[in-house]
Amino acid sequence: MFTLEEANAALTALRPIVERMVQHRRDLTAPQARQTELVTRIAGNGGDMVPSDLQDLAETIQREADAISDCAEQINQAGAQVKSLEEGLLDFPAKRGEEDVLLCWKLGEEIGRAHV
C-alpha cells in the first residue's frame, strides 16, 4: 500500500520506465499492422512478398513485446499496476481510511484521483 507521498516518490524511478514502455508500445504498432497485411497477402496468393519480411517483422514484434513485458514487470515489482500501455496509466494501491483505493497516475500528469 502506498501513501500519496510514497506514490509520488516512487514516480521518480517509475516515470522513465513508463516512458520506455509507452514508446515500445508505439514502436510495436507499425510492425503489427504490416504483419497483418502480409498474412492477409499470404492467405490470398502471396504475391510480391519477400519471405524474410515476415520473419523480420516477427522478430521486431517479439523484441518490442519483450521490452514492454520487462517494463511492466519492473513496475509491478515496485508495487504499482499498469492499466494502459498506450497512455502510460498506473494505479498505486492505497488506503483511504479503512477503504482500499487506487491512486491513479497518467504519464505527463500528477497523481490525480483515488478510485475503488
Where in this protein do the model-derived segments appear?
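Amphipathic alpha-helical coiled-coil segments
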Residues: 14-31, 57, 61-64, 68-71, ...
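Core subunits and conserved enzymes of cellular information-processing
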Residues: 98-99, 105-108
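Conserved small/polar residues in nucleotide/adenosyl-binding loops
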Residues: 114-116
